[in-house]
Structures are given as C-alpha cells and as structure tokens.
Amino acid sequence: MKKWLETLPPEWKKFRYRGYTLEELLAMPMDQFIKLLPARQRRSLLRGLTDAQRRLLWKIRKARQKMLQGKKVVVKTHVRDMIILPEMVGLTIAVYNGKEFIPVKITPEMIGHYLGEFSPTCKQVQHGEPGLKATRSTLHVALK
C-alpha cells in the first residue's frame, strides 16, 4: 500500500475527506469508511455490492498491481452506479455512457461520488444555422 501511495502526486496526499487524509482512508476498515459517506451512498454500500460492482473492484485491484509494475492500465466498465472508494484513486476508469467509454481519471475529490456522474450520457445540444423550413422565421426569407 505504501508503494502505491508514493506514486501519487504530493498534493493528493494533503487532501482530506471529512478530516481524514487519503492514507488514513486507505488504512480504515470499510465499515468505518461507510459511516463517513453521505446518506444515499452510505445506504447503497450498506445494502451490499452487486456482482458487477464486485467484479469491478476485483479488476481495480488487479490494475493497481499492474500500475506498481509500471504499466498503464485503463479499466473499462458499464457499472455507472459504483461509488468511488479511496482504493480507486489514481486509476483511470473508462465508464460506458451508452455509446462509448469515457476515460475518467480518479482524483481524491471524487471519493463518495458515483462513477456515472463523470460520464455524461447526453451531449449538450448545439443548434446550427436555421435553413429553409427549419423554423417559422424562414417563412419571410426570399427563395432564390
């Protein structure tokens, strides 16, 4: 665990979540960490992890071992309802948005949020120039 913490940027080590440093959060038992989370996330984790969430955690632990060997690993997942835990910090997780996998670099500030929050499912609408018969305003445009 110590080796992995040394690979993180120094400003991440100063980060505090509800008064605890990242190192303290990693050493903390899961049931004690769950008590620090907001109600919605706390209830979700107390009900237990789904099979898909357990598989994702297993993939994340394997990816972290590969990171220690110097390999860059991106974990792909469809599990948007997984809560970001301290052990995920520093990894890149590609979250599926319904069309493609959006890479999300996990930072300490993301702890306690859902993965799906960082992979929007809808694009923002960008309206183009109105053409003929596009809107009512084109009724008064002279045809060529």
UniProtKB/Swiss-Prot annotation:
Protein name: Small ribosomal subunit protein uS19
Any one GO biological process: ribosomal small subunit assembly
Record's keyword terms, sorted: Ribonucleoprotein, Ribosomal protein, RNA-binding, rRNA-binding
GO cellular component annotations of the record: cytosolic small ribosomal subunit
Annotated PANTHER family: RIBOSOMAL PROTEIN S19P FAMILY MEMBER, SMALL RIBOSOMAL SUBUNIT PROTEIN US19
Transmembrane segments: none
Protein family membership: Belongs to the universal ribosomal protein uS19 family.
PROSITE patterns xref list: RIBOSOMAL_S19 (PS00323)
